[in-house]
């Protein structure tokens, strides 16, 4: 990979852990620890993203080289690089968890391509000083989910990390998939993921909690210098501008999640990026039947903190924790509080506009809030598939009758027999108002359909789809991984050759582990 432009500015400019032993411990006064990946016994490339490779300066030919396989499986280390694991803390499910860090992520290096910097990180490449009681490895199951999801999210237009490669390690990894005392061996795998950086809210929380204010200042200023060079002014003003940027990009990310029906599942502060990109794809899922109270994470099944409808509020809460972390550099609350107060106000306005656009409405009226609220209510009267409903809504014409409009979206109903009586009346009432509202718009049906189909995806990575790919891959059949990767590169296109994936969750998936129930086990 001769054209890779290596850059080690993170390790050159931030304090390193002087202890080079790879033993689990509390690591203080540092941003990272040097650590080498665990060498896999028999790596095998399952898939690589040519798009992501091109981003970082790797050619199509190099993807299939032995060097690519060895470097991105952790078997070899790139010349002139020193891999490292980052130190950070976080709030998990609302509670302070203390030191966390890269427990099974190892950063290989940064590279520069076309005046943009990217960090290359292996997930599942072995133990680090932050692994606690874990082995630092990952299984094929979770690696396929992460690999496919990051690329699917990118093509949906959602800010995200990217996936470069998915490699089988050749080793067996012991996991208890539901944490119920039934561990079993699974195939090991390594994913290489790519981002501007993997700096998290928790990176600053760790330093603030330990009162390492010199290091905190150094880390914040490093982040501003390299990733927010447009920020200028006095130091305190720079810190506020930085916080505002993070708040704005976080708000935009959450808006996209709500637009496509994505539920992250583990919105801990250590899983929040300062770049406003989606990171750490664990027990995620897409809404199938529209249910704001749904979370895919079994760990959160009781309190549902990270449920779909609560993601904006959690993002807001997480930003409060980031504000608390950088407060010692500012020593004034007013500026931070102002940014935090405007977050939800701005989100509510943006959410309304986004939702109206999903409905094909590009002007605003006084009754729009009622239209949105009433739809969110009627969608829950009987199980209604979110993705299919909004996609098929684009085919409704201004001249359609209420009955015709309902007929066009009825494929979204999981139990069509329930759509009668009061439920049918509620749908008729909503569509009557919606059709009137459509007729107040100036866009033609054809133009509106095109615009709606660029907002409402036809294809998303439903959990049952990922599980089918996992089941096949477990038998060394990677054709579904390839097919889903190709399908999800164009989620807004009709792709009639893949029409079978434009389907509601099958009955068998309602109670299958990996489809309806997911844990953090990976």
Swiss-Prot record:
Q: Which molecular function terms from Gene Ontology are attached?
A: AMPylase activity; ATP binding; magnesium ion binding
Q: Which residues form the active site?
A: 270 (proton acceptor)
Q: Which UniProt keywords apply?
A: ATP-binding, Magnesium, Manganese, Metal-binding, Nucleotide-binding, Nucleotidyltransferase, Transferase
EC assignment = 2.7.7.-, 2.7.7.108
- Does the entry feature the keyword Magnesium, yes or no? yes
**UniProt feature coiled coil, ranges:** none
User: Per its Swiss-Prot or TrEMBL entry, what cofactor is needed?
Assistant: Mg(2+); Mn(2+)
Residues at which Mg(2+) binds: 271, 280
Q: Give the binding site residues for ATP.
A: 101, 103-104, 123, 135-136, 193, 200, 280
Which residues constitute the signal peptide according to the record?
Answer: none
Family, similarity comment: Belongs to the SELO family.
Which NCBIfam families does the entry link to? PRK00029.1
Please give the function described in this protein's UniProt entry: Nucleotidyltransferase involved in the post-translational modification of proteins. It can catalyze the addition of adenosine monophosphate (AMP) or uridine monophosphate (UMP) to a protein, resulting in modifications known as AMPylation and UMPylation.
Q: What is this protein called?
A: Protein nucleotidyltransferase YdiU
Organism field = Flavobacterium johnsoniae (strain ATCC 17061 / DSM 2064 / JCM 8514 / BCRC 14874 / CCUG 350202 / NBRC 14942 / NCIMB 11054 / UW101) (Cytophaga johnsonae)
């Amino acid at each position: 990979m001769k054209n890779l432009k290596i850059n080690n500015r993170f390790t050159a400019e931030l304090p390193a852990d002087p202890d080079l032993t790879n033993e689990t411990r509390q690591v203080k006064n540092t941003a990272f620890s040097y650590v080498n990946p665990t060498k896999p016994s028999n790596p095998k490339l399952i898939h690589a993203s040519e798009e992501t490779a091109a981003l970082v300066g790797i050619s199509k030919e190099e993807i299939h080289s032995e060097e690519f396989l060895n470097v991105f499986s952790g078997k070899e280390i790139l010349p002139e690089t020193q891999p490292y694991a980052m130190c950070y803390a976080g709030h998990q499910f609302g509670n302070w968890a203390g030191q966390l860090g890269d427990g099974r992520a190892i950063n290989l290096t940064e590279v520069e391509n076309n005046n943009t910097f990217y960090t290359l990180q292996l997930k599942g490449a072995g133990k680090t000083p932050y692994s606690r009681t874990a082995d630092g490895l990952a299984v094929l199951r979770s690696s396929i989910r992460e690999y496919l999801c990051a690329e699917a999210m990118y093509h949906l237009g959602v800010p995200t990390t990217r996936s470069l490669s998915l490699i089988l390690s050749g080793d067996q990894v012991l996991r208890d998939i539901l944490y119920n005392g039934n561990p079993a061996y699974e195939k090991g795998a390594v994913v290489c993921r790519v981002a501007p950086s993997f700096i998290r809210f928790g990176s600053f929380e760790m330093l603030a909690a330990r009162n390492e204010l010199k290091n905190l200042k150094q880390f914040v200023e490093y982040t501003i210098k390299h990733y927010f060079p447009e920020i200028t002014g006095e130091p305190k003003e720079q810190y506020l501008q930085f916080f505002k940027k993070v708040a704005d990009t976080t708000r935009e990310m959450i808006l996209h999640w709500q637009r496509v029906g994505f539920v992250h599942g583990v919105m801990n502060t250590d899983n929040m990026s300062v770049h406003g990109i989606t990171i750490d794809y664990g027990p995620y899922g897409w809404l199938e039947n529209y249910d704001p109270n749904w979370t895919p994470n079994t760990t959160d099944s009781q309190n549902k903190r990270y449920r779909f409808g609560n993601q904006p509020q959690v993002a807001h809460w997480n930003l409060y924790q980031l504000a608390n972390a950088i407060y010692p550099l500012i020593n004034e609350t007013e500026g931070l509080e102002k940014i935090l107060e405007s977050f939800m106000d701005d989100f509510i306005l943006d959410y309304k506009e986004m939702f109206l656009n999903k409905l094909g409405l590009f002007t605003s009226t006084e009754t729009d809030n009622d239209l949105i609220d009433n739809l969110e209510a009627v969608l829950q009267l009987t199980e209604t598939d979110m993705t299919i409903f909004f996609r098929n809504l684009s085919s409704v014409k201004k001249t359609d009758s209420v009955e015709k409009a309902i007929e066009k979206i009825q494929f979204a109903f999981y139990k069509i027999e329930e759509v009668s009586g009061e439920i049918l009346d509620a749908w008729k009432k909503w569509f009557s108002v919606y059709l009137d509202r459509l007729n107040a718009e100036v866009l033609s049906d054809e133009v509106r359909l095109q615009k709606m189909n660029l907002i409402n995806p036809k294809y998303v990575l439903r959990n049952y789809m990922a599980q089918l790919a996992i089941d096949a891959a477990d038998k060394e059949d990677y054709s579904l991984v390839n097919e889903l990767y190709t399908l999800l590169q164009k989620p807004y296109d009709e792709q009639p050759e893949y029409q079978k994936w434009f389907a509601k969750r099958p009955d068998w998936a309602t109670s299958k582990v990996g489809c309806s129930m997911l844990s953090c086990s990976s």
